[in-house]
Each structure stands twice: as structure tokens, then as C-alpha cells.
Amino acid sequence: MCRSLRYCVSHCLYLAMTRLEEVNREVNMHSSVRYLGYLARINLLVAICLGLYVRWEKTANSLILVIFILGLFVLGIASILYYYFSMEAASLSLSNLWFGFLLGLLCFLDNSSFKSDVKEETTKYLLLTSIVLRILCALVERISGYVRHRPTLLTTVEFLELVGFAIASTTMLVEKSLSVILLVMALAMLIIDLRMKSFLAIPNLIIFSVLLFFSSLETPQNPIAFACFFICLVTDPFLDIYFSGLSVTERWKPFLHRGRICRRLSVLFTAMIELTFFILSAFKLRDTHLWYFVIPGFSIFGFFWMICHIIFLLTLWGFHTKLNDCHKVYINHRADNNSLDRIMASKGMRHFCLISEQLVFFSLLATAILGAVSWQPTNGIFLSMFLIVLPLESMAHGLFHELGNCLGGTSVGYAIVIPTNFCSPDGQPTLLPPEHVQELNLRSTGMLNAIQRFFAYHMIETYGCDYSTSGLSFDTLHSKLKAFLELRTVDGPRHDTYVLYYSGHTHGSGEWALAGGDILRLDTLLEWWREKNGSFCSRLIIILDSENSTPWVKEVRKINDQYVAVQGAELAKTVDIEEADPPQLGDFTRDWVEYNCNSTNNICWTEKGRTVRAVYGVSKRWSDYTLHLPTGSDVAKHWMLHFPRVTYPLVHLANWLCGLNLFWVCKACFRCLKRLKMSWFLPTVLDTGQGFKLVKS
């Protein structure tokens, strides 16, 4: 007994000590990374102090000494606020502002007369060491998982250091100072572009780096200090391209959730920047040396640029109009836990973004061509504006590209509920006791409420929810289903997914039992679907809560020309009454809706002994399905709806871009692998891409 007790105590102590060592190891690792960051900061401070001291020593400029002493005084105040008054935000803001300002002074003060001085050389090596330590610290932090990524455009540290650096540039002449201030704005745009993981962010970074040290950009006297400032700011967003796990809507949240007025003003701000760039480009016309090339080139490509950017600004305005509509729905349905991306998907934002992506690409192309035609290597203001416009348009292109790829398609749903106990198994009417009638009505009402909840939660447009105790005739059902299957979105194209729910009496072979002895076969329903769907690649998902849904599940697997899925249920034939209640119609609907509408549900479809089992089947080409991509007619309709007639010639160019398919070989191989998976290894849970899943037990 004592030996057992001693063993238990020693084992528990061993586990506790092992866990304590692991925690201490984690804490020590975290502390080491934090101290590495402090070392990089202190090293940079020493480099700045030494560099400013050398400039004061060699130039005897008393203003440098005053600013240097004032900077140390401000940093001392920041330390006091941090350690004695716990005012961390104010302390860090003050220190970051002055770090940017002092580093800017180190860049802009002339050092041509003492470049070979030992102290100046030491300053350069300290700055290079700061760059290495900063990159190493940022990399180790992310590899160790100590960085919590939050949605933001610019961090407070980045903003204040940029402001401080821009203030320091005012020590130069007005034209040079304006060039540097615009360059700082371009750097801010580049940081945001990288943090948003825009599709063209890396090419923009390369272009910015190549142009950064042009003499026309008024590169400071100390390029090492300038490189230190640039690299230290760009390191975090550049590494986050790989390490950040934020989704598209999470990354863009500071912009998408911004107020309506702020977003409208951002379009006007963009228009002002674009107009300024065009005016600066026109200064190239003063170059009389190559007038025979410049004047025709600027006239042609300038006109093309203006048309493309009118389209660009109208696209941004239309995007914000649709986003405002989504925000209204989001505010009204916030209690239903509907996310903004689900609402945007239901409003057809994906289709809008896919077309807008191509239009914004034309704007980027036009800007690049106009910049090349109007290239002014001696005009720093022009080059700085060029570096502002590129990431700005790249961000718009990246936003439309990512939303077009991540948002789900539009969907519409129709539900039919016919109580099954109004007739006997041979189809003859039968009288029911009053209590059974009440139970039947409650169960049918529960199914209607559940499917309406499902439609509302997943933002599925509801065509109707029909409830009939006497059944539906074939003609009535035919007219209703045809009207449902030909529904279209507000923008014109068909919905991506059509969801049809049926709960009612069925025959043994799966046909729906209708009033008057009529039946509806799956073949008949698919004929109507082919007639309405045509060449359009929409999906039809049929959800059956009936006693004989398995035949349709098996039959749908033979279909080769359409994207059709059937989700059904199997009710247990024999049930031990002592262990579980007999299954009834409506039980599957309740569980399936709960599974798809409640992320914290505890429903296990593979659980043994389930009285209601799920089963689904998909057509052979189901895995080939992709959400509808804009066709030439879609682009033309979008153009006529949103843009003036003068821009219509660009429709043909847009249609040509839509028709490009450069990776068809890779796509064909991938399609074969997905078909093999769906035919041989049908997954237990199949994500439809609309927010809900098909399941099998």
C-alpha cells in the first residue's frame, strides 16, 4: 500500500516538474526573443546617437546638438511614462515618433565631407547590424508562434515612424521635401499592399526597391540609414505573407467594416491621386527632344488611361454601393450570427468582384504603359506618385481577386412539405384520431420552421415554402418547379446553386406521390432542370426527408451531364422501443439543419445505433463543378449596367481576357483525380461551398 502511494506521489511530482520545466523553457524562449528585439532597438539608438554626434562634430551645427539633446530628453520622458506611470501607449507612441524623426535626420544631413571617418563607418556597421537583428527577431517570433496577427492596415509603430521620417524631410528644400513626403506615402501604401497579401504585392516591392535609390527620388545622403528605415518597416508585412493565417475578410476587415462615408471618401481620395499622377505625367510633353514620340504616345495612351480609370473609379463606387447594401443586411441580421462574407456571397458580390478584377487589371496595365511613355527620371515627384499609384491599384485588384475566389456563390431554395399520414401505404385516404392529427401538424410545422431557419442562416434566397395537407397535383407542382428553376439573380445570371427540399409521401422506387395518383420521377425533374439550366453550370441539390429516398440517391450517381446531388435519409425498420423511439419523418430534417446551422452541435452521423441514418449521392461530374465565371455576355451586361457608352469598345478586350485558359492541362489532370476520389472514396462529409454540408452515415 505504502509503495503504491509512494509511486503515485513520485509520479505526480515528476509530471508536475516536467510540465514546469516546459513552461519555463517556453517563458525563457519568449523572453529571449523579446530581448533580441530590445537589442535591435538599442543598437539602432546607439547608431543614431553616434551618427548625429559625428555630424555635429564635423559641421559645428548647433541645431543638430539641440535636436540631439531634445531627442534624448523626449526618449527619457517616454521611459518615465512607461516604467513609472504605466502609460505604455503614450510612451511607445512618443518614442516611435522620435525614432523616425532622428533616423530621418541621420539620412538627410550631408555627410559627404566625412564619409571615411571612423565614427561614420562605425555608424554604418551599427545600422547594418540593426537590420540583421530586426529581421532575425521578426523571423524567430513568427517561427516560435509568438505573434498574434490582428486585422490592421498600418500599425501604430509604422504610422508614427513614417510621420517622424516625413517631418525630418522638412529640413531640405521644399521640392525635395515634397518628393520625400510622397515617397513616405508610397512606402505606407506598399506596407498595406504587402499586409493585405495582394496578388501583385511582391512585384510592387521589387519595383519600389529598384527605384528607391534613384538620384531623382532625392535619396538621402546616407543610403545605409535609408535602407535601415525601409527594411525595418517592410520586414513584418513581408514575412506575414507566409506566416499570417488571417482569412481574406479578416485581413480586409479594417476596410470592409469602415463607415459608409469613410469608404466613399476613400474613392474621392483615390480619384485625386490618379488625377495628380496624370497631370504629372503630362509634364513629359515639355520634352521637345523626342516630341515626335512623346506627343502621339501620350495622346493615345493617355486617352486609354482616362477611359480605364473612369471605369476603375466607377467600379470602386459600385463596389461600395453593393457593400452598403450588405452592411444593411448585416446590421439587421447580426443577432442571427450571419457573417459579412456570407451576406456578400448571397448578394452576388463574387460575380461582381470577378468582373471588376479584370477591369482593375486594365487600369494597372494602363498606368504601367503611361508611366513608361511619360518616364521622367529627373522628376522625383513624378516617380514618387508613380510608386503611390501602383500599390493603390494593386490593392484594389487584390481585393477583387481574393473576394472573387473566396466568396460563395448565390443560391435559391424551395421547400415542399406534405404530411404523409393522410393516406394509407396503398395510397388510399384514411381517417386519423384527433391527437394524431395534432401531432402530425406539429411535426410538419417543425419541418417548415427548420428548413426556413436553414435558408435564413445560409442566406439562401427563399422562393417559397409550400405546405399542403391534401397534396399537390402534377400540373401545380410542374408550374411551381419550372418557375423555381428559372430564377435568376438581380444582376442577370442564374444562381449558382438551387436547393430543393421535399418531405412527403413516396413510393418504394422513390417517386413522389402526388394528388390524384400522379407521380414525379427523378428523370422528369432532371428534364425540367436541363431545359431551364441549358449550358449554364448551376447545381441542383435535392434534400429528401422521406421513407424512400435511397433509390434517388443511387440513381443520381448515374447522371453524367449535370451537377446534381441528392441528400436523403434512411429510417431504421426495426427499433428497440426500450432504447430509442421509432424514427419519424422530420427527425432527419431537425438533425441535418442543426448540424449545418450550429457549429457547437454534438451530432455524430457515424454513431452506431442511429435510428435515422444519412445518405447522399452526387452525379459523376459533381467534382468538376466550379462557381460560375463571367462569360462574355455577363461582362457585356455588367458594362451596360454600370459604365457609360463611350467605354463599350473595351468590352471585346475584357471578353478576350475572360477566354484565356493557360493552365488547362493541369486543370484536366486535377479534374480526373477529383472524379476518382468521388467515385471510389466518397467522403463522409462533403462541403458544398455554400456553407452547408452533405453527410452520410
UniProtKB/Swiss-Prot annotation:
Keywords: Glycoprotein, Membrane, Nucleus, Transmembrane, Transmembrane helix. Its main location: nucleus. GO terms for biological process: regulation of ubiquitin-dependent protein catabolic process. GO terms for molecular function: sodium channel regulator activity. It is found in: Nucleus membrane. GO terms for cellular component: nuclear membrane; transport vesicle. Disulfide bonds: none annotated. The chain crosses the membrane at residues 36-56, 63-83, 89-109, 172-192, 199-219, 223-243, 265-285, 293-313, 352-372, 380-400. Glycans are attached at residues 111, 337, 533, 598. The keyword Glycosyltransferase does not apply. It is a multi-pass membrane protein. Plays a key role in maintaining the cardiac electrical stability by modulating cell surface expression of SCN5A. Plays a role i the modulation of anxiety behavior by regulating GABAergic neuronal system in the nucleus accumbens. Belongs to the TMEM168 family. This is Transmembrane protein 168. It comes from Mus musculus. The gene is Tmem168.
